[in-house]
UniProtKB/Swiss-Prot annotation:
Biased composition (Low complexity): 1-13
A cellular component term, taken from the record's GO annotations: ribonucleoprotein complex
Chief localisation class: cytoplasm
Protein name: ATP-dependent RNA helicase DBP2
A Gene Ontology biological process term: nuclear-transcribed mRNA catabolic process, nonsense-mediated decay
Protein encoded by which gene: DBP2
Organism placement in taxonomy: Eukaryota, Fungi, Dikarya, Ascomycota, Saccharomycotina
Catalytic activity: ATP + H2O = ADP + phosphate + H(+)
Region feature (Disordered): 1-70, 500-562
Binding-site residues, ATP: A171, A172, T173, G174, S175, G176, K177, T178
Role: ATP-dependent RNA helicase involved nonsense-mediated mRNA decay and ribosome biogenesis through rRNA processing.
PROSITE patterns, per database record: DEAD_ATP_HELICASE, HELICASE_ATP_BIND_1, HELICASE_CTER, Q_MOTIF
SMART domains registered for this protein in UniProt: DEXDc, HELICc
Region annotation (RNA-binding RGG-box) ranges: 518-546
Amino acid sequence: MSYNNGGYNNRNGGSYGGGYGGGGSRGGRDGYSGGGRGGGYGGGDRDQGGYRGGRFSGGGRGGGRFNDAPRQELTAPQWDLEQLPKFEKNFYSEHPDVAARSDRDIEQFRKENEMTVKGHDIPHPITTFDEAGFPDYVLQEVKDQGFPKPTPIQCQGWPMALSGRDMIGIAATGSGKTLSYCLPSIVHINAQPQLQYGDGPIVLVLAPTRELAVQIQTECSKFGKSSRIRNTCVYGGAPKGPQIRDLARGVEICIATPGRLIDMLEAGKTNLKRVTYLVLDEADRMLDMGFEPQIRKIVDQIRPDRQTLMWSATWPKEVQQLTRDYLNDPIQVTIGSLELAASHTITQLVEVIDEFSKRDRLVKHLESALNEKDNKILVFASTKRTCDEITTYLRSDGWPALAIHGDKEQNERDWVLDEFRKGKTSIMVATDVAARGIDVKGITHVINYDMPGNIEDYVHRIGRTGRGGASGTAISFFTEGNSKLGGDLCKIMREANQTVPPELQRFDRRSYGSHMRFGQGRGGRGGRGGRGGRGGRGGYGGGGGYRSTGGNSAPLGGNRRF
């Protein structure tokens, strides 16, 4: 959590919060731990068993239960725009160098950066940080980070966001989307009236996973410190108490996963009356994970004349419908093609094998990949159990592997990510859900131990490597059970100028008869594969294998592979 005490200065002068979070908030912590923590925490969101322990909604209060607090089902307010306080949202002033560029120059720049735009009166793209028009206090933070130049999505996204328009940004994961909305949000906040006691946030960022939410918070903290902008991260799987305390003190930015935020709203721990800048990050992922009802419930709580920014890696019809419902006359920028495609800097290798061969092939590829000591390998498995089993197997064989999946506690997930980021462990085994939104620099190899259920997830998975123009390698184990992916996988590989192995090409058939034939083949093999897999687990897992966090606690074998 990030909280800055002391005077808060906005762009128009004046101070806010001198002492507001000082002695009073310290007292709140003392009161909270004295009166509340005796009961302990009993989990996270409503579907995880609720919350036990001290109820906190102000300095020093304790006792009671979070679930004992009155809860009110959220209903959509009836908005009267005439009665709502006015607010500023257009802060863009075109730089003279940008204004001087010809239409031909702009068209050429967009073409070189695979940039397409849609809508009317779209601001011209910028090419340098100085052209973006950020105030000095924001610009200095950017320069201090040592970025050489804006990414393509930032070149077009910053002018769009600063103009106050509703906007859609479509670009691959790792393209710089977070800063595309984070920096304009700082300018937006500093132009708004100061928060008063009991006010909710000014900026709300919705994200699909806690890992992505924490990463966004890190960026907001880094670039908001010069303005003393306070933020909090509200997500499930962690105690509610610290999150409630941050909200009670007042934060300008709230980064949240949908389920936990609804918990807070229904319990009256915060409100969205002050939100004038709404961000939906990885909108496609949120919808894939079934968050659409929660998103709609949350957005209905926000004034309709807000500025809304939607960011997505893909453009499926579900995201388009959400856009039509909640964005007003939006402008859109797309980096790359709207057609699903893999990065051309990634070498894609597909091996058509059976289930029994996966472990041996995995070890062979690890031996090759870890010849370079700085390489990082991300291994994807289809289930939490498989994650732990692979990790246990690798560790028993001396490989420095750690697992991350949804059944692990947040502190263990954070630890695994930190070990992987810092290179203390070179192999991380993950499920799709656990890996969504994770941004780890320097991943050199992605191995699909199990293929994903759809081609979109395949592209997202392998996109963890080959970022920022660097090269990467994606290795996939394709079995008969993955035959429905065959045609789409061949198409993705050909588009990226990859060699499609002949064994995979035989699955590139879309007729009903072909699917029936492959389906019948899968049935017979599936039974034998299941029995063999269970036997393998019994052999190394020790009577039933490892559960939950067991894989990460398995000792490293004597044959150290690093």
